[in-house]
Amino acid sequence: GVSDAAAYGVNGTAELADAIRTVKGQNIYLVAVVSTCVDTLMAERYAATAQQTASGSAYTDSSGGWVDPYNTFTRTYLVSLCKELRELGFDEVAFSYLQQPLAAAELKYAGQTGSPSRTDAVVALAKYLRTSLSATGLRVSAIVSADSILQEKAKLSGQDMTVLPKLFDRVCVFAT
Protein backbone atom coordinates (compact mmCIF):
# COMPACT_ATOMS: atom_id res chain seq x y z
CA GLY A 1 0.00 0.00 0.00
CA VAL A 2 0.89 3.65 0.14
CA SER A 3 1.81 4.80 3.65
CA ASP A 4 -0.06 8.14 3.60
CA ALA A 5 -3.23 6.39 2.47
CA ALA A 6 -2.67 3.71 5.10
CA ALA A 7 -2.20 6.35 7.80
CA TYR A 8 -5.65 7.73 7.01
CA GLY A 9 -7.22 4.29 6.62
CA VAL A 10 -8.15 4.86 2.97
CA ASN A 11 -5.66 2.60 1.23
CA GLY A 12 -6.38 -0.48 -0.80
CA THR A 13 -5.02 -3.90 0.01
CA ALA A 14 -2.38 -4.25 -2.70
CA GLU A 15 1.28 -3.99 -1.76
CA LEU A 16 2.75 -2.10 -4.69
CA ALA A 17 6.44 -1.69 -3.89
CA ASP A 18 7.63 -5.11 -5.09
CA ALA A 19 5.50 -5.04 -8.23
CA ILE A 20 6.69 -1.54 -9.08
CA ARG A 21 10.35 -2.52 -8.66
CA THR A 22 9.81 -5.48 -10.99
CA VAL A 23 8.11 -3.37 -13.65
CA LYS A 24 10.62 -0.52 -13.36
CA GLY A 25 13.39 -3.10 -13.77
CA GLN A 26 11.94 -3.77 -17.22
CA ASN A 27 12.23 -0.05 -18.08
CA ILE A 28 8.46 0.43 -18.29
CA TYR A 29 6.95 3.92 -17.94
CA LEU A 30 4.49 3.88 -15.04
CA VAL A 31 1.38 6.01 -14.72
CA ALA A 32 -0.72 6.04 -11.54
CA VAL A 33 -4.35 7.08 -11.86
CA VAL A 34 -5.39 9.11 -8.82
CA SER A 35 -9.05 9.91 -8.21
CA THR A 36 -9.20 13.51 -7.05
CA CYS A 37 -12.78 14.49 -6.26
CA VAL A 38 -14.36 11.05 -5.82
CA ASP A 39 -13.07 9.26 -2.74
CA THR A 40 -15.83 7.48 -0.87
CA LEU A 41 -13.63 6.29 2.00
CA MET A 42 -12.19 9.76 2.58
CA ALA A 43 -15.64 11.39 2.44
CA GLU A 44 -17.06 8.83 4.88
CA ARG A 45 -14.18 8.67 7.35
CA TYR A 46 -13.38 12.39 7.36
CA ALA A 47 -16.75 14.10 7.03
CA ALA A 48 -15.13 17.54 6.84
CA THR A 49 -13.65 16.57 3.46
CA ALA A 50 -17.02 15.63 1.93
CA GLN A 51 -18.49 17.77 -0.82
CA GLN A 52 -21.67 19.28 0.57
CA THR A 53 -25.00 20.04 -0.99
CA ALA A 54 -26.67 23.39 -0.36
CA SER A 55 -28.51 21.78 2.57
CA GLY A 56 -25.22 20.68 4.16
CA SER A 57 -25.45 16.94 3.53
CA ALA A 58 -22.59 14.97 1.98
CA TYR A 59 -22.92 14.63 -1.79
CA THR A 60 -22.87 11.08 -3.17
CA ASP A 61 -23.97 9.59 -6.45
CA SER A 62 -23.36 6.45 -8.52
CA SER A 63 -19.65 7.39 -8.76
CA GLY A 64 -19.33 7.38 -4.96
CA GLY A 65 -18.67 9.94 -2.26
CA TRP A 66 -17.33 13.27 -3.49
CA VAL A 67 -14.75 15.38 -1.65
CA ASP A 68 -14.56 19.16 -1.59
CA PRO A 69 -11.89 20.47 -3.99
CA TYR A 70 -11.23 23.47 -1.72
CA ASN A 71 -10.74 21.41 1.44
CA THR A 72 -7.17 21.87 2.73
CA PHE A 73 -6.95 18.34 4.11
CA THR A 74 -8.03 16.86 0.76
CA ARG A 75 -5.52 18.96 -1.16
CA THR A 76 -2.64 18.16 1.19
CA TYR A 77 -3.48 14.46 1.08
CA LEU A 78 -3.55 14.38 -2.74
CA VAL A 79 -0.16 16.11 -3.01
CA SER A 80 1.36 13.85 -0.37
CA LEU A 81 -0.02 10.75 -2.10
CA CYS A 82 1.41 11.85 -5.46
CA LYS A 83 4.82 12.54 -3.97
CA GLU A 84 4.83 9.11 -2.41
CA LEU A 85 3.86 7.53 -5.72
CA ARG A 86 6.83 9.32 -7.29
CA GLU A 87 9.12 7.91 -4.60
CA LEU A 88 7.75 4.43 -5.32
CA GLY A 89 8.81 4.81 -8.96
CA PHE A 90 5.83 6.17 -10.86
CA ASP A 91 6.74 8.49 -13.73
CA GLU A 92 3.37 10.19 -14.02
CA VAL A 93 0.08 10.68 -12.23
CA ALA A 94 -3.13 11.07 -14.18
CA PHE A 95 -5.91 12.71 -12.21
CA SER A 96 -9.31 11.13 -12.75
CA TYR A 97 -12.49 12.73 -11.46
CA LEU A 98 -10.87 16.15 -11.58
CA GLN A 99 -14.35 17.50 -11.94
CA GLN A 100 -17.58 18.20 -10.17
CA PRO A 101 -20.68 15.99 -10.24
CA LEU A 102 -22.73 16.22 -13.42
CA ALA A 103 -25.98 16.42 -11.44
CA ALA A 104 -27.60 19.83 -11.20
CA ALA A 105 -27.51 19.83 -7.39
CA GLU A 106 -26.29 23.05 -5.82
CA LEU A 107 -22.95 22.55 -4.02
CA LYS A 108 -21.25 24.32 -1.11
CA TYR A 109 -17.48 24.67 -0.83
CA ALA A 110 -15.36 24.74 2.35
CA GLY A 111 -14.10 28.13 3.41
CA GLN A 112 -15.38 29.90 0.31
CA THR A 113 -17.33 33.11 0.51
CA GLY A 114 -19.90 33.73 -2.14
CA SER A 115 -20.69 31.01 -4.62
CA PRO A 116 -17.69 29.97 -6.70
CA SER A 117 -18.63 28.16 -9.89
CA ARG A 118 -17.86 24.52 -10.45
CA THR A 119 -15.27 25.61 -13.00
CA ASP A 120 -13.65 27.85 -10.38
CA ALA A 121 -13.48 24.87 -8.00
CA VAL A 122 -11.93 22.48 -10.52
CA VAL A 123 -9.45 25.03 -11.88
CA ALA A 124 -8.40 26.06 -8.36
CA LEU A 125 -7.67 22.43 -7.45
CA ALA A 126 -5.89 21.80 -10.76
CA LYS A 127 -3.66 24.85 -10.25
CA TYR A 128 -2.90 23.83 -6.67
CA LEU A 129 -1.94 20.29 -7.70
CA ARG A 130 0.19 21.47 -10.62
CA THR A 131 2.03 24.06 -8.53
CA SER A 132 2.56 21.73 -5.58
CA LEU A 133 3.97 18.94 -7.75
CA SER A 134 6.05 21.00 -10.18
CA ALA A 135 9.37 20.43 -8.40
CA THR A 136 8.95 16.65 -8.10
CA GLY A 137 9.86 15.69 -11.66
CA LEU A 138 6.56 13.84 -11.80
CA ARG A 139 4.53 14.29 -14.97
CA VAL A 140 1.04 15.44 -14.11
CA SER A 141 -1.93 14.77 -16.38
CA ALA A 142 -5.70 14.96 -16.26
CA ILE A 143 -8.30 12.50 -17.47
CA VAL A 144 -11.48 14.15 -18.69
CA SER A 145 -14.72 12.58 -19.77
CA ALA A 146 -15.84 13.15 -23.34
CA ASP A 147 -19.37 13.54 -21.98
CA SER A 148 -18.38 16.15 -19.43
CA ILE A 149 -16.52 18.39 -21.88
CA LEU A 150 -19.44 18.66 -24.25
CA GLN A 151 -20.69 22.22 -24.26
CA GLU A 152 -23.88 21.56 -22.29
CA LYS A 153 -22.12 19.58 -19.54
CA ALA A 154 -18.85 21.51 -19.20
CA LYS A 155 -20.34 24.00 -16.74
CA LEU A 156 -21.54 21.15 -14.52
CA SER A 157 -18.25 19.19 -14.62
CA GLY A 158 -16.10 22.30 -14.25
CA GLN A 159 -13.61 20.87 -16.74
CA ASP A 160 -12.53 23.97 -18.66
CA MET A 161 -10.71 22.82 -21.77
CA THR A 162 -9.25 26.28 -22.31
CA VAL A 163 -7.39 25.98 -18.98
CA LEU A 164 -6.66 22.30 -18.25
CA PRO A 165 -4.38 21.70 -21.28
CA LYS A 166 -2.24 24.65 -20.14
CA LEU A 167 -1.81 23.22 -16.64
CA PHE A 168 -1.06 19.58 -17.38
CA ASP A 169 1.54 17.66 -19.34
CA ARG A 170 -1.27 15.94 -21.17
CA VAL A 171 -5.04 15.70 -21.09
CA CYS A 172 -6.52 12.29 -21.80
CA VAL A 173 -10.12 12.11 -22.97
CA PHE A 174 -12.00 9.08 -21.70
CA ALA A 175 -14.60 8.21 -24.31
CA THR A 176 -17.64 6.47 -22.92
Positions of predicted regions on the chain:
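Active-site-adjacent "subsite" loops/lids of carbohydrate-active enzymes
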Residues: 37-83
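Aromatic- and acid-rich polysaccharide-binding/catalytic face
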Residues: 142, 157-176
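An active-site-proximal structural segment forming one wall of the substrate-binding cleft
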Residues: 65-98, 159-165
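Active-site-proximal loop/short-helix segments
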Residues: 40, 46, 91-119
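Aromatic-lined carbohydrate-binding/catalytic grooves of carbohydrate-active enzymes
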Residues: 1-13, 109
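Soluble non-cytosolic domains of exported or imported proteins
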Residues: 10-14, 68-76, 116-123
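Generic structural signal for well-ordered alpha-helices
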Residues: 16-21, 82-83, 123-130, 161, ...
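Aromatic-lined carbohydrate-recognition surfaces of secreted/lumenal glycan-active proteins
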Residues: 29-39, 94-95, 116-158
